[in-house]
Amino acid sequence: MTNKNAFLEAKTYIPGGVDSPVRAFGSVGSDPVFIDHGNGEFLYDIEGNEYIDYVLSWGPLIFGHCDSDIEEAVIKTAKKGLSFGAPCLLETALAKLVLSKFPWLGKIRFVSSGTEATMSAIRLARGYSKKNGIIKFEGCYHGHSDSLLVKAGSGATTFGYSSSLGVPEDIVKNTHIAIYNDIQSVEQCFKNEDIGVIIVEPIAGNMGLVPADQVFLDALRKLCDEYGAVLIFDEVMSGFRASATGSYEFNKIQADIITFGKVIGGGMSAAAFAAKNEIMEMISPLGGVYQAGTLSGNPVAMAAGLASLSKIYNSPNLYKDLENKSKFIVEALENSAKKAGIALQTEVRGSMWGYFFNDRPVKNYKDALNSDTKMFAKFHAQMIKRGIYLAPSQFETGFVCDKLSQKSLEKTANAIEESFKAL
């Protein structure tokens, strides 16, 4: 079966043919690639084509596809049972491993998705602060829970949605939108509203890769302390991706709550939220903030996460090596764009990298929206034709894995140069 025919059949039974909107390749004007299997840094579609993968399941696969250690842990655990709906030792082991890197956080609760993590973190923060007002930032994506689907990033930006149908005004009336990297817009919210929570991606990855400025994050911490608000860092993407301590490696700010996902599950469906002890004491069964989940902390996902984080902690040069790979790609992009006379902005944070077809530095959502999405679509088409699998949106982040070889990097650089020449 061809990719085109597979997509046609999928659309008969699945809305838009996909289970997550960006996968439909609509923003790049082509049909999606249907994947048969992966191995290392490679993907193989149902037509037998090979691609070097820079999406890596949107971030989780820091050790690439079919990593032997993670596979072994998953298979060994699955043979004992897939899920019990009861406590297991793997939950505690993974909790200890995560918290060892974040000593100011007292406890962690596992869930099954990043959306669950941020949704639960917001509820917990409101319960603790006893205030309903939330500040979120244009272009930051925190999953698809109702109160956070306002000027969100990721697919919401890709498809031009300012919010979502089906979200009542009463749900979002307590969600206040500020401008990323603009502290004055945050201060204005505090002056006019009863704010109990700030949620932010300290390294935004869902409007493209846009790290927050240090002075901006310092000011957020100060405002939360001054007004008695809870500071949530959404590190579903950047946690264990940008570094072994996520954004903390770069900003040294201790958020009150941190959400994790993607890498923490080793490729399985797992996420978490961790908080200071005095906040986490509010969560059920200790306190009155309710949160639960049938598959939360299931043994197979915990085993995958434990294997993934154990490898990370035992690989002292991992993030430096990954950063060098990211820089190699970004330098190839910059050099080829310059030769072609095409404006391009780039960014790197550890194993995360990004680029915008834009003639000005991108510091916020408005800047990102000024990027040339038509040029991006042309570039994406040229790259996938040359066996390079990139995210099908200008507003997503690229990732590298440890399996990515120098040979694959050089093939990528050649594909970049040829693609820019063809634009």
From Swiss-Prot:
Q: Which UniProt keywords apply?
A: Cytoplasm, Isomerase, Porphyrin biosynthesis, Pyridoxal phosphate
Example GO CC term: the record gives:
cytoplasm
Q: Which Gene3D superfamilies match?
A: Aspartate Aminotransferase, domain 1, Type I PLP-dependent aspartate aminotransferase-like (Major domain)
Q: Which Pfam families match?
A: Aminotran_3
**Keyword Cytoplasm appears in the UniProt entry:** yes
Q: Where is this protein localized, as stated in its record? A: Cytoplasm
Q: What is its main location?
A: cytoplasm
Gene encoding the protein = hemL
Q: Which PROSITE patterns match?
A: AA_TRANSFER_CLASS_3
EC nos: 5.4.3.8
Q: Which family does it belong to?
A: Belongs to the class-III pyridoxal-phosphate-dependent aminotransferase family. HemL subfamily.
Gene Ontology BP annotations: protoporphyrinogen IX biosynthetic process
**Which PANTHER family does this one have?**
GLUTAMATE-1-SEMIALDEHYDE 2,1-AMINOMUTASE (PTHR43713), GLUTAMATE-1-SEMIALDEHYDE 2,1-AMINOMUTASE 1, CHLOROPLASTIC-RELATED (PTHR43713:SF3)
How this chain assembles, per its entry, is: Homodimer.
The identity of this protein, by name, is: Glutamate-1-semialdehyde 2,1-aminomutase
